[in-house]
A protein has these predicted regions:
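Acidic, histidine-bearing metal-coordination/catalytic regions of metal-dependent phosphoesterases
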Residues: 2-126, 130-328, 350-351, 586, ...
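Metal-dependent phosphoester/phosphodiester hydrolase catalytic core
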Residues: 202, 206-574, 580-585, 592-621
Length: 621
């Protein structure tokens, strides 16, 4: 009898497992973001034209995106939540209802990132049925037509006493270098505009130097300073040793971009685009390595920033110990996500001696909604002006399916779309344009997509897994030449970062399949040139492997660290117990690296919610 029971139990468990896998295969179909499942292959398949291998579901999603591009005001909106469409179909001819509704915002003048109180009164018929379709939109400039709002909120999400004829909420506003106003809409039977708020302006609206950040060039005597204003001028940085006069001056260049510069919808539509202002870029030269400098940026006759400071780079080969931070997949989420990450990394710089950081792709999650770039750049500014903010490219900066001729990375066709992957439309048509114009990385590859630099005892190599990385591709050829030229007597530590992971215990089927192809293409090179550490993101979690090669723990392998929990929604996929996985946790946090000397390096994972180090490993030569 017991044997029969065991057999029945075994069959039930087997049936449940089969159902679970079947459901998983259905859930992670393309268009949801995890792609189509194909059999593992022993070789990397050549890249094909996109439409040669799209299955029916992905083709339908592509058609839907292209159809939306033809409609005014129906662009896909960022992550509110992830890839949510605008609250109504078209907001073109909204009627103004003659009502007593009042919408007001206070104060009417606000700093960048300042809080305002938005209040509404006398909403007609405040019942759940009629008010469930109410929404409030932000328009900048205030003269924008009703189909050109830059952000929106459902009233049911904002109001604590919903439904009611009145309500209020505190919101953070970001300086978009023009005036703004809010409008209250209802969409019960058709779109009606119930009320328009007073106008809001920003302190030093167009002159305010915004979004300041630093970048290394690979030369310890240099530092790059970048920022944004609403006015065009000769960008100027005054700098000097802290404690003395800022008696050195460097001038630079400026650039900007338009919605028409981007590859596809919604990014290239006018409906949710904000003029990014003038993006200024100044190179500081003649710096002493590993020295504290103070600086300010602006232009004579215009407003300057407050005085900031940074520590210049450590000269390559110097055995001075240093610390840096690495993370991926940030966004602008509430604690313990992005906002906590930003606050803790600022403390790392100010209190713990961190002098540099690397963001491994998926930066703002704007996905075509320009206002999210304003939000995210403002979030990182308090610490990106204190230490170089080096970046890599993720799928949400780069992936596109149309308009490839506008891709500033000059990827052929409409980008990288291998038949075995889930490369699609994840940038919302941005195709790298915002990040290319906002961040200037070292110019020894195809920056900001792939490049390298040296800092002290470490050689850093940054790759793009959103571009062709297979054998024979320009990036693959560059990588081999790049790693073969590293002088390990000068920079004994070799660290590679890219967005997508080779190793993950999470069961996102096609992302895992992509990882297998990355392993096939890149792992032999990493093993040949004895890469010490590979740091990645994409999966929104934390995981560390053993020294691994070809899925086996070996003494001469490479440690892979997945640190994709800087802020975006944490993953929820099942996790399998692979032998190469040494630590896994579903937590927000970031990586901290201490380069002690030529023979010892410490990796630590710092958990956001309590700032505890929950995983660490020493690497030795």
């Amino acid at each position: 009898m017991k044997a029969v029971v065991r057999r029945v139990a075994y069959c039930i468990v087997l049936l449940v497992c089969i159902m679970y896998v079947s459901i998983g295969l259905f859930i992670y179909m393309p268009g949801i973001s995890k792609g189509n499942v194909k059999q593992k292959t022993d070789s990397v398949e050549p890249v094909r034209p996109l439409f040669d291998h799209l299955d029916v579901l992905k083709k339908l999603r592509v058609d839907y995106v292209l159809e939306k591009a033809k409609e005014a005001g129906t662009a896909e909106i960022g992550s509110k939540p992830y890839w949510r469409w605008s609250p109504v179909g078209q907001v073109v001819d909204s009627q103004f209802r003659d009502s007593n509704t009042v919408l007001s915002v206070m104060p009417s003048v606000v700093e960048n990132g300042g809080s305002v109180t938005l209040e509404w009164k006398n909403i007609p018929d405040p019942s759940p049925r009629t008010r469930s379709s109410d929404w409030i939109a932000l328009f900048c400039p205030s003269s924008s037509p009703s189909n050109r709002y830059i952000d929106y909120w459902s009233v049911s999400d904002l109001a604590t006493d919903y439904p009611s004829s009145s309500g209020s909420v505190n919101l953070i506003l970001y300086n978009v270098r023009t005036d703004c106003e809010f409008r209250y809409f209802t969409n019960d039977t058709y779109v009606e505009l119930l009320a328009v708020s007073n106008k809001v302006t920003f302190v030093d609206s167009t002159e305010a130097p915004l979004h300041g950040h630093l970048a290394l060039t690979g030369d310890a005597s240099q530092m790059r300073v970048q920022w944004t204003t609403g006015v065009q001028y000769t960008p100027t940085v005054d700098y000097g040793l802290c404690g003395s006069e800022l008696d050195n001056t460097s001038k630079g260049t400026s650039r900007t971009y338009k919605n028409s510069d981007m590859c596809g919808p919604p990014a290239n539509l006018s409906a949710h685009f904000i003029e990014p202002g003038y993006l200024h870029d100044v190179l500081l030269t003649g710096l002493k390595p590993n020295t504290r400098y103070c600086y300010r940026y602006g232009s004579p006759g215009f407003k300057y920033s407050s005085e900031q400071n940074f520590t210049s780079a450590i000269e390559p080969g110097s055995d001075i110990p240093f610390k840096f931070v690495m993370y991926g997949d940030m966004d602008t989420t509430l604690p313990p996500g992005s906002i906590t990450t930003a606050a803790l990394v600022k403390k790392e710089i100010e209190e713990n001696g961190v002098t540099m950081l690397i963001h491994i792709g998926d930066l703002s999650y704007a996905i075509g909604l320009a206002y999210r770039w304003e939000m995210w750049m403002s979030l990182i500014e308090p610490y990106s002006v204190l230490a170089p903010y080096m970046i890599g490219i993720g799928n949400h900066e780069q992936e596109h399916i149309v308009g490839g001729e506008k891709d500033p990375s000059h990827a052929p066709g409409n980008g990288f779309h291998p038949s075995w992957g889930n490369y699609g439309h994840d940038s919302g048509g941005e195709c790298g344009v915002p990040v290319y114009n906002r961040f200037h990385m070292p110019e020894n590859g195809n920056q900001p997509w792939w490049y390298s630099f040296e800092y002290g005892l470490v050689h850093f190599t940054v790759l793009s897994t959103e571009h062709n990385f297979t054998q024979g591709s320009p990036q693959h050829t560059w990588l081999r030449n790049e790693l073969s030229s590293v002088d390990r007597s000068r920079t004994p530590w070799l660290i590679v970062s890219c967005h997508r992971a080779m190793y993950s215990s999470e069961q996102y089927f096609v992302d895992n399949q992509v990882g297998e192809h990355i392993r096939h293409a890149l792992e032999p090179i990493f093993h040949e040139y004895r890469v010490d550490l590979v740091v990645v993101g994409h999966y929104h979690t934390y995981e560390r492997t053993c020294k691994v090669y070809r899925e086996q723990c070996v003494e001469d392998g490479t440690i892979h660290v997945l640190v994709g929990g800087a802020g975006f929604i944490l993953d929820s996929a099942p996790v399998l117990p692979f032998r190469w996985s040494k630590h896994f946790e579903l937590e927000f946090g970031y990586g901290r690296v201490t380069v002690a000397n030529k023979t010892a390096l410490l990796w630590e994972f710092v958990r956001n919610r309590d700032r505890k180090v929950t995983d660490s490993v020493w690497l030795y030569h």
